[in-house]
Regions:
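Long amphipathic alpha-helical segments used for membrane anchoring, targeting, substrate engagement
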Residues: 1-29, 77-99
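Conserved acidic
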Residues: 2, 59-66
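Short, small/polar residue-rich loop motifs at catalytic or cofactor-binding pockets
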Residues: 21, 31-33, 57
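N-terminal intrinsically disordered, cationic/polar leader segments
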Residues: 25-49
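A short interface-forming secondary-structure element
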Residues: 48-60
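Short, charged/polar low-complexity linear motifs in solvent-exposed/disordered segments
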Residues: 54, 64-65, 80-81
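Stable alpha-helical structural segments in soluble proteins, enriched in small hydrophobic residues
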Residues: 66, 70-78
Length: 99
C-alpha cells in the first residue's frame, strides 16, 4: 500500500473521529439522580439539573459535593467514550496527535 495514501486515509479518519467527538453528549448523575449534568466531547458542561429537594441552606455543602461528583463522572465517561472510538478506529494502537 502506498504510504502517502495510508497517511491520507489516517488523516480523514482522524477528522471523522474529531467530528464524532465534537457531537458527543454524555450525561452523568450523582446523589441518586438529584444532580444531573450533560457534557460534550470537549468536556464542556452543557447543562446542569438539580432536584429542588437538595436546594436549601443546610444542604449547600452536600449539593456542592453532588455537583462535583456528577461533573467528574461525566468527564470520566467522555474519556471512556473517546477511548472506545479511538480503539475501534486504530485497532488499539495509540496514534500521536489523533486528538
Amino acid at each position: 500500500m502506498n504510504p502517502q495514501k495510508l497517511m491520507n486515509q489516517l488523516k480523514q479518519a482522524q477528522e471523522r473521529m474529531q467530528q464524532e467527538i465534537a457531537t458527543l453528549q454524555i450525561e452523568a448523575a450523582s446523589g441518586g439522580g438529584m444532580v444531573k449534568v450533560v457534557m460534550d466531547g470537549q468536556k464542556n458542561l452543557k447543562s446542569l439539573r438539580i432536584d429542588p429537594e437538595v436546594v436549601s441552606k443546610e444542604e449547600v455543602e452536600m449539593l456542592q459535593d453532588l455537583v462535583t461528583a456528577a461533573v467528574n463522572e461525566a468527564a470520566r465517561k467522555v474519556d471512556e467514550e473517546i477511548q472506545e472510538k479511538i480503539g475501534g478506529l486504530a485497532g488499539g494502537m495509540k496514534i500521536p496527535g489523533l486528538l
